């Protein structure tokens, strides 16, 4: 798929070129993986439509969504998003899995779930896929399910529970260098509060939905201080804007590689 680059230099690029330019694993620190979050929003700032984020994005957003999955060691997602979006195998395209292996990655990224309550939807397709590896960090005891997927549960002290603790575990115990967070809005807000987001990929869809109930991309209480963003690039396709931001003060902002 071709995209129109608006910034920094106008040009036509492909999704494959965008993916190959990311180099996310090279930006990891010894302490934790490099973390990017991918979110979608309507033009009036809503992150869900009829309770889901999936219907908001168009073809370009979905192409970039899958391209990002093809570039990372792990995908982190909240239990609510797992449940609502009915997650299955993270990389379904065989060619993408082969390309991952050529780059030194596993065929599929690890699926990482961080939960305080321990209530993980074990009935979703992800746990029925024998090719999937799921790592769960929980503040409450969880019995690993008897499922075709490989599932590892790590208990966290409730007093030390947090995204930063889970990310350190992914880096030290699983060798994860790059993490893609797919939300939802509560998870993104928690990660921003802990200052563990390095980059934000945000698609703004040409839709207006109105209302006061739908969440924004970062839900919950306001952040202690606004998180400043630095635009890395802006792409467009059929009215969809795909924006890549570096989070000010985080790793990689000065090292990001524009397409």
Regions found by a protein language model. Give the residues of each.
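Enzymes that bind and transform nitrogen-containing heteroaromatic metabolites
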Residues: 1-259
């Amino acid at each position: 798929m071709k995209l129109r680059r608006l910034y920094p230099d106008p040009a036509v690029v492909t999704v494959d070129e965008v993916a190959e330019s990311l180099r996310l694993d090279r930006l990891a620190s010894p302490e934790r993986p490099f973390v990017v979050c991918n979110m979608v929003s309507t033009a009036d700032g809503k992150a869900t439509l009829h309770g889901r984020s999936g219907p908001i994005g168009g073809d370009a957003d979905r192409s970039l969504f899958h391209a990002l999955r093809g570039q990372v060691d792990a995908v982190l997602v909240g239990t609510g998003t797992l449940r609502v979006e009915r997650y299955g195998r993270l990389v379904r395209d065989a060619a993408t899995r082969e390309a991952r292996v050529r780059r030194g990655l596993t065929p599929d990224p690890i699926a990482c779930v961080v939960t305080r309550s321990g209530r993980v939807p074990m009935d979703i397709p992800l746990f029925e896929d024998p090719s999937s590896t799921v790592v769960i960090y929980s503040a409450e005891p969880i019995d690993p399910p008897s499922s075709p997927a490989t599932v590892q549960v790590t208990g966290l002290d409730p007093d030390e529970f947090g995204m930063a603790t889970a990310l350190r575990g992914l880096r030290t115990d699983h060798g994860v260098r790059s993490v893609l967070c797919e939300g939802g809005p509560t998870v993104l807000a928690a990660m921003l509060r802990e200052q563990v987001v390095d980059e934000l990929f945000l698609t703004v869809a040409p839709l207006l939905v109105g209302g006061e109930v739908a969440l924004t991309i970062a839900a919950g209480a306001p952040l202690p201080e606004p998180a400043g963003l630095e635009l890395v690039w802006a792409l467009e396709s059929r009215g969809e804007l795909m924006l890549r931001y570096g989070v000010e003060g985080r790793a990689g902002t000065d090292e990001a590689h524009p397409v």
